[in-house]
């Protein structure tokens, strides 16, 4: 898990966020990969789901750990690096096998500023405390056991109510 966090922090530093709090950088990276093409509302919603998971005892209690949660395996390269098992993580970008490089640094900087606001200010939760979201063209089996709260852009938001 430490290697996964180190990889994410390296991506953040390469994007110009090296001086920032790691949690804010992780949140920005998640919003960037999950919602960079969406409106501010769509980006806020993705950020709020991430933070709602941090507040929920069923997930780890840090943003970076929520994002990297899931099974990992040793890299086939023999380097000792632990990599996420494909398609078995909380956020698809993290374990889809594609590069996590930030290709739009200006977009990332704007999202990073948004992540700072989300981390440091109380806001009305536009997802109604949602802890899950799929794209509207996906029908995951888990959605049957969650309560739908809203739809923003192309994401449908759900809350996992039973603790």
Where are these regions (language model features)?
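Sec-dependent signal peptide recognition
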Residues: 1-11
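Cleavable N-terminal signal peptides
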Residues: 8-10, 18-21
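Bacterial extracytoplasmic/cell-wall-associated proteins, especially those involved in peptidoglycan
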Residues: 21-163
